[in-house]
Amino acid sequence: AACVISEHIRRPEQLRFYAVGLLENMKLADSLGLTKIQRRHIDRIRSEFEQRCGMDAAAFLAQARYDAVDSIVRQAAGHAAKRPHTWSDRFDALALNRFLAFPIFAAVVSMMFTICFGSMGLAMKRAAEQFFIQAADFLRRALPEFGVSNFWIGLAADGVAGGVGSVLAFLPQVALIFLCLTILEECGYLARAAFLMDYFLRRIGLTGKSFIPLLMGFGCTTSAVMAARTLGSDRDRRMTILLTPYLSCSARLPIYVLLTGVFFPSHQGAAVAMLYLLGIAAACAVGFWLRTGPYRTYSAPYLMELPPYRVPSLRNVLHSTFSKCGDFLRKAGTLIFLLSVLIWMMQHINLHLLWTADASQSIFTAVGNALAPLFRPLGFGNGKAAVALLAGLVSKEAVVSSLGVACAGAHSFETALTELFTPLSAASFLTFCALYAPCVSALATMRRELHSIKTTVIAAVSQILVAYGAALAVYQIGLLCQRVLSSFP
């Protein structure tokens, strides 16, 4: 066949391709411009070829190609099987072992919490607190020398330094959280965690692919909701968006650290971990309900390629950590600053918009007294706590800054908090803070990603009701246990 068509082929390297092609299909003869005699010659060659091999020429050539592919695959597979195990493979034999994987994961998470909330994190927090306390005292001493009025002194020392400083005091521990998560991501362990979580996420109707957006929810709910765009299934994307707000974002961390440090100092790390687990449990419960109700369909299979373990790049780790801390600082420097000033002004202006030295006549007290009865069954039916929760809908950091401004006149912030809460009511307050609706920025992002105001409002109201029910259960069950224990001599 090659001899017959050689005069029609301009490039010698194409001769074999066209010769084999003519044995399979004569349509190539038209493109080559073969004569009738040449076509009959090719037909005779094909007939002789089929008689010798005992089958159709096209089928024979197809089988030959499959045999060649099989041979290549066997060679490649045999070569891969002989590849020596790397240290990544050896570590995965432990990190992904069916019996050891989850204890290792728990140990990694426990180590992270110990670093952030143990002696090192606590010492860094106390140093930051002392800095802002001294800054406020300095303003109170220095500003009168420049003839500044008491109004501006109070605003600067109690409003700004007391409000913004109460949030920035937790920056060291927030930075440690970001640092640990970045290291785990850089070294490749977070991808293994996503693989491990696939089994559990399927129990609530999701896949391991949702783990990364959900994990980002521990940093910022807004960015986590936007990260859900990467999910291929619309069902998985919507479910992930609805469950993410139940996970404790970094903005809630200052609330946890503040109150657990005051009321549960001996078990602060365990208390903070339990609040994170509470959010995870709530997300699982809601996800299970969604899977059996509104989103009763099967999720798509999850396929992923595990990256090799790498030594984290110091440059990347520091850049990511500083970038995330920068977002925290920008929020403290803008939104928290404005809220702190607003709350301080509300404490010193009455309902007639006139300056008042009597805090009981202020707008702050009026709003707090109106909201307080709603939270009385939860154990913290006081105006300061109610207004702090209301401010938390704007930004969760504002809960701490609101309490800081409200308690600015006290000798000690911690002492003022013990007058607002008991250990039991503080536990109830923390439960509510861990579960209630996210900030307005996250809600706006949810509305944009879900393309539905109705769904967003239902999600926010449902989350507030879940938080209220959980806090009510904590406080009322705690009261019952106290009564039972007090009945024993």
Give the role of each language-model region.
Residues 130, 134-138, 193-221, 296-320, ...:
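Juxtamembrane inter-helical linkers in multi-pass membrane proteins
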Residues 52, 59-63, 122-159, 204, ...:
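Extended, low-charge hydrophobic alpha-helical regions
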